[in-house]
């Protein structure tokens, strides 16, 4: 991937593409990522280079942009930061109307960040927005250039060492050098190799009892992410720090629905965000008196498995008021 700023000439970009293409470590075609004027130059150079895809951030618009976009010989993504830049929002809508290509070229607006949101070490840099745009960029680059990874299989291997072999060293080998894991409801996990390894070693692998039941409900694959929806059932018969820190075993059975968002960097797990209904879990082990609060027990997880389980159980009075009304 050739990254381009505003300090290159068209001739330099063409020359650089030929040099990169001739390198022995270069496999396949090239993609270009450009910023501002660099984005415009990348699009202009496309017909004279081996670019197979172009990602353009905050494209500098010229009088000939419409004609240029019609003649670019490869698919492209145009990405604009629109926060505090209404002119970019207008431009995005205009470009969406102009572009009618059938090669997957698209235009994106990121209202969370302004111009320059994707350039680190600048005041305009926005980490979260850059992450969103990075995923979009990979969507195009992976589709055109690869590489292709089986994220479901890679994560299955990670989970195998977490729960079956309970081997911390092998678990860490499935991750990048600076991973992090966040069990969101309890803020448990670790950031960085040493902290996460400590978490796995002393607060995770030995707390995975054999009586656990897990059913995969769905999974969604993205360019660099895997989203898993699971039904999980276990007995709180031992200390489980990630679910119930500071709470002694109660012997109660717990059924929860979990969502795991796994980000990959290459073929390694980069980070995990894990979500579940902590109110439901605490209610099931008997340490939370929900009273009249709308906090479900195991029926919440069961309804994820079977949509025909009862609905609207906490709004029966309100639900009755709409009985017989036209729909």
Please annotate each region the language model reported.
Residues 2-25, 30, 135:
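Alpha/beta-hydrolase active-site loop
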């Amino acid at each position: 991937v050739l990254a381009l700023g505003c300090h290159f000439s068209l001739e330099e970009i063409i020359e650089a593409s030929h040099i990169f293409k001739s390198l022995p470590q270069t496999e396949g075609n090239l993609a270009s990522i450009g910023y501002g004027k660099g984005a415009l130059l990348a699009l202009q150079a496309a017909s004279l280079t081996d670019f197979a895809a172009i990602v353009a951030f905050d494209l500098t618009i010229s009088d000939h942009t419409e004609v240029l976009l019609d003649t670019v010989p490869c698919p492209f993504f145009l990405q604009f930061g629109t926060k505090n830049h209404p002119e970019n929002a207008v431009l995005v809508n205009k470009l969406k109307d102009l572009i009618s290509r059938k090669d997957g070229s698209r235009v994106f607006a990121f209202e969370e960040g302004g111009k320059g949101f994707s350039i680190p070490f600048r005041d305009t840099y926005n980490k979260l927005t850059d992450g969103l745009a990075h995923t979009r960029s990979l969507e195009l680059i992976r589709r055109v250039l690869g590489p292709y990874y089986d994220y479901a299989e890679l994560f299955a291997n990670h989970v195998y060492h977490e729960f079956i072999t309970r081997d911390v060293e092998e678990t860490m080998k499935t991750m990048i050098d600076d991973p992090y894991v966040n069990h969101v409801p309890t803020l448990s996990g670790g950031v960085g190799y040493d902290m996460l390894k400590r978490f796995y070693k002393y607060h995770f692998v030995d707390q995975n009892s054999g009586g656990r039941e897990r059913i995969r409900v769905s999974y969604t694959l993205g360019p660099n992410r895997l989203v898993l929806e699971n039904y999980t059932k276990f007995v709180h018969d031992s200390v489980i720090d990630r679910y119930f820190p500071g709470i002694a075993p109660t012997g109660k059975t717990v059924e929860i629905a979990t969502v795991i968002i796994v980000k990959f960097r290459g073929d390694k797990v980069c980070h995990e965000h894990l979500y579940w209904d902590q109110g439901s879990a605490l209610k099931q082990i008997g340490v939370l008196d929900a009273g009249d609060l709308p906090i479900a027990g195991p029926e919440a997880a069961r309804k994820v498995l079977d949509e025909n389980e009862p609905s609207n159980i906490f709004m029966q009075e309100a639900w009755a008021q709409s009985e017989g009304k036209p729909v």
